[in-house]
């Protein structure tokens, strides 16, 4: 069948193979070819390279170049039982997939990210009704938003390293967590006490995190390196657009039925996404595809000596090493690396400001302009316009600043900071504009949203690219720490946001001084890209984490 051959390693095709309805003839032929290759020396020296859980698919985490290591590596490569790609044009290698298949995979990972990510803010239109039904205050009800955000900051600490192992891969994590995410939406829709709702929202946040944590990894699995920044930017734009579209959908559900239908909608969106991914989303993680090939070769030949290099390395990692790499190292790097600490703080404050808007919007658009729930949802469309413009600006800056430096050999990681330096002023501008023009006309706060996304989107892209380039060996730890800091601030800001605006409000300017407070904070933090552009090279030379 064309479907089973094109979409191998999907959940449906895997199930059909397990039930014996279809068979993998290509793998069987490969197994027979491998059986004809006999090892020249069965007593070869075993190579045991140093292992790091965060080692990428094409990067060795051990930098030793001794003769014994080189000899062991050469023997390992000549081992006839070591499963690898069948040459550079192997059709199972995700980098060699047809463009249509790659495009469908990118679309699906964007859809998965949007559906799960919108779960954070889709709740906000129903918050007042939840307060009334459960007889709780604003802060307690806001925990349903805050703990969801905290959950998807905690999840990547465990899920990201697991997704890089040969045994688990990305697909299994996506599908298992999405299934339980869907189930927990049923719980949220039927719960009858605020404590149960808060707990299920927190768990839902953890379950939604794999798409946020490893979606970029999926893109990198299938897209050629020169195109990765642009495709990642498109995926990131979708991730930003999702939580600002969600309040409109949530408002429509509350307006049509009640707050519980918000979670029924999220459940049905999750179910539709689950079905689509089950049929058309294949495994993209290179190590897992090779691991599957090795398992089939063992089964078809009856020879258990077939193995993959990454699975062999994974087995050498004990629980203590795994916990150190996933829990301790991100915190240690934040404390010891000034560049990481500075950008984690900058990104965290910017992300917290984003979720602060969910507290400010009702004050402005309901309190001043008397918008309905749906109209307030439409007021978030300024963020969506900003996403489109921000992605276009990112592409222009990338082509004008980054690409020429790659081509003429003058590229350094600090080149990415030029992008952040160009747009960092937009962040405080957006906050001042939102706060001080709230009573002039409703369109001006909406315009401020555009400036906000122009800044935040490009600062995020520049920061992540800079940190990944500076710390390639420990990029998973860097991003795990950044994600946790980001989610912690985004969790906290909505909890004190309403009190901050109420206490700093004046009669004519209800959100001006509150917005200005965080605006001045972001204005002070805007100096970070400039400082690191100047002192970044010297900081890298003194860092033990950037040594090759």
Swiss-Prot record:
The chain crosses the membrane at residues 104-124, 139-159, 179-199, 203-223, 230-250, 261-281, 347-367, 376-396, 416-436, 440-460, 476-496, 511-531. The keyword Transport applies. It comes from the Eukaryota. It holds the Pfam family MFS_1. One of its GO terms (cellular component) is plasma membrane. CDD domains: MFS_Tpo1_MDR_like (cd17323). Coiled coil: none annotated. It is a multi-pass membrane protein. It is found in: Membrane. Keywords: Membrane, Transmembrane, Transmembrane helix, Transport. Probable efflux transporter. Confers resistance to the azole derivative fluconazole (FCZ). This is Fluconazole resistance protein 1. It comes from Saccharomyces cerevisiae (strain ATCC 204508 / S288c). The gene is FLR1.
